[in-house]
Amino acid sequence: SSSQSGTASDAYSESSIEGYTLYTNGRFGYSIAYPNYYLVPYVSENGSGITIEDNNDDEIRIDVWGNNNSAGETLDERFLSLVETVGIEGYTASGDTWYVYSYEANGRVIYTKEYVGSGSIATMSISYPRSMSSVGDALVEAVAPTFEPGDTSVAH
């Protein structure tokens, strides 16, 4: 719909993980926890998502966003399309409703987790310099399990 008045707003609350903030997207309903000292320098105009960056330097970033699955893509189609587009062999994993694809490009590690539903898609991408992989890997281990998709069976 063109009217945004009925759209729930984003929420930031205390996470069950100590020292973390829980972000819940008002439009798509997905949520993710991130370290308290990280900043949110970018919020998309259409309410689809945000960018979260390390306060110490912006080399470590978490992007989360949702989009409607208007093309009716399946999990396998989304996954294969991304791997093909990037064209880099990396780490992959998948479940019934999600996949993970992690690879290295231009000196950066990019870790993507995506939930694909018939109505909508929720995506999280964490990226960091290869030189900071110990910090980045630990961030992925802490943050990735907190990423919950909301209701992807419907469009938002």
Q: Regions from the language model: what does each represent?
A:
Residues S1-T21:
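N-terminal, intrinsically disordered, polar/charged segments of Gram-positive cell-envelope systems
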Residues S13-E14, Y23, V40-V43, I52-E53, ...:
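Short, exposed beta-strand/loop patches in secreted or surface proteins that constitute
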Residues S15, G26, Y30, N67-A71, ...:
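Extracytoplasmic/periplasmic, Sec-exported soluble proteins
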Residues T24-T74, S102-G107:
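Secretory pathway targeting signatures of secreted, lumenal, and periplasmic proteins
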Residues L39, L80, E84-G87, P145-T152:
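Sec-exported extracytoplasmic/periplasmic mature domains
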Residues I121-H156:
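Surface-exposed amphipathic alpha-helical segments
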